[in-house]
Amino acid sequence: MSSQFSPREIPSIILAWAVLSIGLSYSFILGLVNGNTSDLQYLIAAAIATATGFILHEMGHKFVAIRRGYVAHFQIWIWGIALTLITAVASGGSFLFGAPGAVYIAPAAAIGAYGYGYYSSNQQAADPQQENMLISAAGPGINLVFAIFFLVIYELSTTYNFVAILATFGLELNVGLGSFNMLPIPPLDGYKVFKKNIQFALMIALPLWGMFLYFFLH
């Protein structure tokens, strides 16, 4: 597993995770600073939700790409990190533009530039659009799975305890990130999936969009 990551990649993933977790729970961090220790559970829930909604979304892209014979590495985006923190601070935690980094993909021939291993595939680029569709769909697909998982937990919760808080954060992040990324607009994931297979794209997009409309606009 370690051979699948470049030396800088793990620190980059941890930094992106921390920044997005801080942005997602910024208002509760302010509560902690002001002595409200009960807000710690919100920070922990945000960190777990970020791991499922953002980190696993990006790792979905990465490992499907590797499995298809490509080189894939996560790279932080400095301006994205700044924008994530600025929007969180400026809005007091009520609005967040979360874009701390992304997975970058290259042909396997580029492996020397990154210096780490990958699963080889003799079928690489047999159908570039098909490959691109599968890689692009992996992230929102993971968001959909976790959105359904957290929805079940949310509906089964009878009291507003830590589990319910985690389910709320998990729903917000997975539904928000997944539904946005499935919009058929370049360069989003949805554009690449819809371009190749509309029916397959709708199988992922419609449940995410439906949950977004219900939970965010209801």
Residue ranges and their predicted role:
Residues M1-H218:
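Hydrophobic transmembrane alpha-helices and their immediate loop junctions
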